[in-house]
Amino acid sequence: MNTLATPTGLSAASLRHSVSDLKQDRRNEPHVGEKSAAWCLATFTGRLTELSGELSGASLSLVFGLVLEAQKQAEPVAWITSRDSTFFPPDAAERGIDLAALAVVRTGDLLETAKAAEHLLRSAAFGLLVLDLGTDTRMPLPVQARLAGQARHHETALVCLTVKPAKEPSLGSMVSLQAHARKVQQQGRIFRCRIEVLKDKHRGPGWSHMEVGRGPDGLC
């Protein structure tokens, strides 16, 4: 058992205050991968979600956390994109993501991305689908309705990543949860990403989430 020695000349009351201050400091320290209770895979299961950011790094960092959570729960994950460049694999691996278990589907355009997503949703084999759309947000409402319906029916989390300002409207009315991510602080390889929920059909808008991570400079 470890023992705590009282330094000469330090009263018991002073020691109690010192220990209390130390505990408070530890509570205030950022924890890598820290999450709020609402920001978890269960929040997005069965829903069409849009996660946007003016730069893709912040939203990528936050969705990596959901991918990792899904993999820890043995839920298969697929990443679908029509973009020429998407996430940097070493960044994902450093977050703990098993790249060998992550299915990546590349398509020609947004409609092909939506068709691939619908096909994978109908298979009922995936717990999380990420649609990396970039700046292309012209998804027709009937397509959104089909995707949202399949996500709900098969209890799959369907997350669309978009690159745009927070003031721009969501993909459409079928989006159940819309959130905007941004980097608020970075010191070396430790960064903070904040997400503001702009629309939530289940809980209502206005809640936020802060996540602390560690990664290559510029990831967030």
For each feature predicted by the language model, list its residue ranges:
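Detector for small/aliphatic-rich hydrophobic stretches
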Residues: 1-79, 94-97, 200, 220
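Conserved RecA-like P-loop NTPase ATPase core
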Residues: 51, 102, 129, 151, ...
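Charged, alpha-helix-enriched surfaces in structured cytosolic catalytic cores
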Residues: 58-65, 108-115, 138-146, 153, ...
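Hydrophobic/aromatic ligand-binding patch that stacks against planar heteroaromatic rings
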Residues: 69, 120, 150
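Short glycine-/polar-rich loops that comprise or flank the Walker A/P-loop
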Residues: 74-75, 98-101, 126, 154-157, ...
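Conserved inter-motif catalytic segment of the P-loop NTP-binding fold
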Residues: 74-142
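A contiguous pocket-lining binding segment that forms or flanks enzyme active sites
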Residues: 125-166
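Phosphate-binding/switch region of NTP-binding enzymes
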Residues: 158-220
